Amino acid sequence: MSYDSLFQPLRIGSMEIPNRFCVGPLTLPSLHDAFGAFSEDGLAYFEARARGGFGLIFTGAFHPDVLVDPVHPYDSKQPLKAPKSFMRSSVELLERLDAYGAKMLPQVSMGFGRNALGCFCPSEIPYYHDPSRLAPALTVDQIHQKIDQMIATAVLLKQCGFPGIEVHAMHWGYLLDQFAMSFMNHRTDEYGGALENRLRCAREILDGVKAACGSDFVVSMRLALKAYMKGYN
């Protein structure tokens, strides 16, 4: 068996990566400071992966929302909270990665939904960690606020010099995944019902990022096409 293709460059839109090896998203609190910027540990962590030869590196999920959901106690990765600090650390990180030819796509999430107490969901459904409590349902205005913050974060990331982003979408039961599943989305407006409506949030994020950042800005979307959990498909 030949593995030659794994070591060949790959072009994704305007972004060229030196090989087919990538580092998947990983969330570690130590990689960021209290204001969401990359910490010294974070800079060293990602630089080590680039030095090791990975062509593409994904960050753990950033959570842009500072208006609707409460700040989760273990998640400080909110670029819009202190954008100047975030940009300074990002520029330094990209300089380190460029030395090895590696590219990075920051992952951006619409939110936790039922996975974090106090957060909003597509519908009034039980929280995962405490099913005795029901999560409040997002209003249409709140959905728009969340989408707008996703787009604003993509614009900030482009200004930092990142070639694109990955939207943390239909994966592992987080908010966009909850919107996609009729099992959790009981809405009767434009964001519920038919599959097209349940995917509307993801589509509006994709279209909004492309409109704001340009067609040459790479937008990856993390999708799990099948969930091996009862009632999730």
Report each predicted region and the residues it spans:
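Flavin-dependent oxidoreductase catalytic cores
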Residues: 1-233
